[in-house]
Amino acid sequence: MTVMSDTDALEGLEPTETIDVKKVFGLDTKMKVKGFKTGTEYVPEIDEAYRFDPQTTLAILAGFEHNRRVMVQGYHGTGKSTHIEQIAARLNWPMIRVNLDSHVSRIDMVGKDAIVLKEGVQVTEFREGILPWALQRPVAIVFDEYDAGRPDVMFVIQRVLEASGKLTLLDQNRVIAPNPSFRLFATTNTVGLGDTTGL
């Protein structure tokens, strides 16, 4: 497991490498996308045996290349998150996955005040949550089980789905603009409408 840290191996990284989609993903297309020259601890491992669904792959690649929010829908266990992960691995794109189960709260997403020791003295300091941390870095964040997210969490995510993608931290009187290489993806089973079985 990779731990998010304040010491930043991601600082200054940009996707500068041109990647030939036909060569890397085996798809019949002339599409080229940008990726990172080298990987970091946040880049998923490549599964050489993974086979890409062409239509889904092109949609995800468009999300990476053109900074578009992409939601992948499908049944449980069909590899939605793995699909995004394996594309990120081949682009050397740092990625984190967040499962939006009932245990993920607004505080986890935004951050909270914490008591820390500084020079032997206890002080209160704001600790960024998952979303501000990722938003400021060249990271692809994947929200798994998007349709299962709690309402308070979904309101936080809603703001970064918009065109400018800025996140306002009211408690900190701060507005965070996204890193140019920040990307957002989601996976879902139902798209909020139930599925073909009526569940």
Language model segments and positions:
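AAA+ P-loop NTPase catalytic core and its hallmark functional loops
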Residues: 2-199
